[in-house]
Amino acid sequence: MNARVEQLEFQAEARQLLDLMIHSVYSNKDSFLRELISNASDALDKLRIEAFRNKDLEVDTSDLHIETEADKGARTLTVRDNGIGMTRAEVVDLIGTLAKSGTAELRAQLREAKNDAASEELIGQFGIGFYSSFMVADKVELLTRKAGESEATKWESSGEGTYTIESVEGAPQGTSVTLHLKPEDAEDELYDYTADWKLRHLIKKYSDFIAWPIRMEVEKRVPAPHEEGEEPGEETVVLETETLNSMKALWARPKDEVSADEYNEFYKHIAHAWDDPMEVIAMKAEGTFEYQALLFIPSHAQHDLFNRDAVFGIQLYVKRVFIMGDCDQLMPEYLRFVKGVVDAQDMSLNVSREILQQDRQIKAIRRRLTKKVLSTIKDLQSERPEDYRTFWTQFGKVVKEGLLADFDNRETLLEISSFASTHSEEEPTTLAGYVERMKEDQTQIFFATGDSRQQILKSPHLEAFRAKGYEVLLLTEPVDEVWVGVVNEFDGKPLQSVAKGEVDLDSDGEGSEAEREEQQKEFADLLGWLKETLGEQVKEVRLSTRLTESPACLITDTFGITPALARIYRATGQDVPVGKRTLELNPTHPLVIGLRQAQASADDDAKKEAVSETAELLYGTALLAEGGAPDDPARFAELLADRLTRTL
């Protein structure tokens, strides 16, 4: 065979990131072994599943295991598995992971990380834990052969900007990673990773629960053989293969028998995370459907939380046999950040995603898991408000997706949700908190949507609400534009957008019915003329009760699609036209009063054209005030420049 040997360079950003790894962005260098063993465990899981599905794959799965081998003389440490292995193309793709678009962002965040824990968390989030090997090694060699393939691949790098990759023969199935260790340096927390006791300690600490045996050849002293009655001879040193981990399923043990450290390490293994979880949820169901579940709510959101192609975090086992690693049928999409394990007792091992979609037991488990996670979040909200606030900051955006899809749990989702509001700049509010603060004459929960808090607060739609002291929820995330269209009320109180439909804010008697009727008569000609002048740009022109400072604003019908929502739909490839909107005028504003007088007195073509242009400018400023743009920006700019010129 002609070996294909290539020497390649890391991309510039990847090289800088690798340099950060080599120079130890965090002090707990022991974590490298956990990452290598976790990768090996994944490879064994994948082989067992592939052998089960592909009967033509001729592999021996009777003794799947992980080995660690230390060579004190050569100062090397090897972690080896007989799992699925990788092809040359897959190895190249693995290297490419380091150079994907998120690298620059990660590099910046690593430099800004305030402590070791923050750095560990970031490394785990971006899935580059393999490269933590360079914290303890001057050179890393990877040898791998894919199950069912004859050609193996060798990858090697010293982390200095280049790596080599070549095709080789004669390698065993699976993957081995050999680290050429750096010299010991206690000050830099570089220990002797060839020492049996150190490896035992790290494997027990980080990987005791791994489902596959982790083996190591250890030296043992045994007495020399001797006859009975004779003095024993000198002890001899023999090598014995020892299994270093207990392989006990953590979820099958009573919660009070599992330490917090054990839960934390198990979470880091299954989630490929480097930080501790925020909450542990242990469940056991007996009866019609028997299953055990161990779920974790992370402390931080993973970087691909909003990537629809990202894998889910729930592993499915049947009678402690691994079935699949990203079972999206066990948790709704809006809880995709939850990590964990579900071990069912009565399900067929011959299971596929298509079968799962129809499985009654899976649907029942999903319902129970969902309710348990939501009740746990509710407990956080009431018992640990600081943790809840962190949770909502990290995951609130995706949890609110459930308001659209999960009707059965909608009330609970509304209860656990938090929103910014005009009540406080610092503290978000729950809907229950909002209802408690409602004024006596208030019957609706008012909200406003927009791109930012600052933009919403400057919107003319809020003026009368602010003047009357009504609290308004400030909804600034894209999902908010969507869920408010399907959630009509909370606790019997209707939800009302300040920018949709008609609102009556004069019901307290400040503006009498007679006064409003008089205003209507006074402005009737202007309203009709504006509707005719603006034509297809507006559905209606009317007087407003929601404006106190601005001359005009645009209102969407109660059940209409807002421009912001239409932009969201268009971004997803859906062309949704925005219906015509209503122009509301402030009858007390000098511009509106002046326009009424100018329109009434326009008695020649020049004056009529001037007031028509003023009408266009008024409509354009209403669009700008809400964060939109005029339909014809060039025309608007021309009219504005002309009007400004006349004032000079």
Swiss-Prot record:
Supply the source organism for this entry.
Mycobacterium ulcerans (strain Agy99)
Provide the function of this protein: Molecular chaperone. Has ATPase activity.
Protein family per UniProt: Belongs to the heat shock protein 90 family.
Q: Which PANTHER family match?
A: HEAT SHOCK PROTEIN 90 FAMILY MEMBER
Query: What is this protein identified as?
Result: Chaperone protein HtpG
Answer whether the UniProt record assigns the keyword ATP-binding to this protein. Answer: yes
GO molecular function terms noted in the UniProt entry = ATP binding; ATP hydrolysis activity; ATP-dependent protein folding chaperone; unfolded protein binding
Q: What is the lineage of its organism?
A: Bacteria, Bacillati, Actinomycetota, Actinomycetes, Mycobacteriales
Q: Which domain of life is it from?
A: Bacteria
What the entry lists under InterPro entries is as follows: HATPase_C_sf, HSP90_C, Hsp90_fam, Hsp90_N, Ribosomal_Su5_D2-typ_SF
| NCBIfam families, per the entry | PRK05218.1
Q: How does it assemble?
A: Homodimer.
